[in-house]
Design a protein with these regions (language model features):
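Long, low-complexity, charge-rich intrinsically disordered regions
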Residues: 115-154
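Accessory beta->alpha helical hairpin/"wing" motif in late/C-terminal subdomains of nucleic-acid enzymes
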Residues: 51-92, 97-112
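Short secondary-structure junctions and interdomain/linker hinges
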Residues: 22-25, 51, 73, 123-124, ...
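Short, amphipathic alpha-helical interface elements at domain boundaries
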Residues: 1-45, 55
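Short glycine-rich, low-complexity/disordered patches
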Residues: 29-30, 51-57, 79, 126-132
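Glycine-centered, phosphate/nucleic-acid-interacting loop/turn motifs that mediate DNA/RNA or nucleotide
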Residues: 48
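Long, highly charged amphipathic alpha-helices
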Residues: 39, 112-115
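Alpha-helix boundary/capping residues
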Residues: 19, 69-70, 120
Length: 154
């Protein structure tokens, strides 16, 4: 069973801006300027995803880890209207779009993520592989091989 962190699109957009994510799903259409920051921060605080410390809003350690992984991820895979994946140095993450919310799911290895994608049928949607940083050619090539091998093992 995958443990996920449910959040609204507004909450995700606010955190994505804070962590300066280079890649987000195309189906996220909210612009940061459209957000009611006080309302969104209030919801994040009530849910324990952001905490007040010395008058500052500080993300929970788990949220900090997950969004830092996404921000420093050299490669992503995405391309459907329901799921988007990041492959970081210490975790693989999937953002799944549900009817009312987004679920951010961390996996310890890419293989665990591939298994989840197979179980839920996402691999049949032909997730497109995208390379963010051309300077990361070796890492991107290795990730693409791992990605393809992960689906072949199923």
């Amino acid at each position: 069973m995958v443990t996920g962190y449910r959040m609204t699109e507004d909450e995700f957009v606010l955190l994505a801006c804070f962590y300066e994510l280079a890649a987000i799903p195309a189906w996220i259409v909210r612009e940061p300027e459209e957000l009611d920051l006080e309302r969104v921060l209030g919801k994040l605080e009530r849910r324990g995803l952001v905490q007040k410390m010395d008058g500052q809003d500080v993300p929970h350690l788990v949220i900090d880890f997950l969004f830092s992984e996404m921000a420093h991820s050299p490669c992503t895979a995405g391309g459907t209207d329901r799921i988007f994946c990041w492959f970081g140095a210490h975790a693989a993450l999937a953002l799944e779009r549900n009817v009312t919310a987004l679920s951010l799911m961390p996996f310890q290895t890419p293989q665990e993520l591939f298994a989840y994608l197979r179980e839920t049928g996402y691999e049949r949607e032909n997730l497109a592989f995208a390379q963010l940083d051309p300077a990361q050619d070796d890492a991107a090539a290795q990730l693409k091989e791992t990605w393809e091998a992960g689906f072949e093992q199923g």
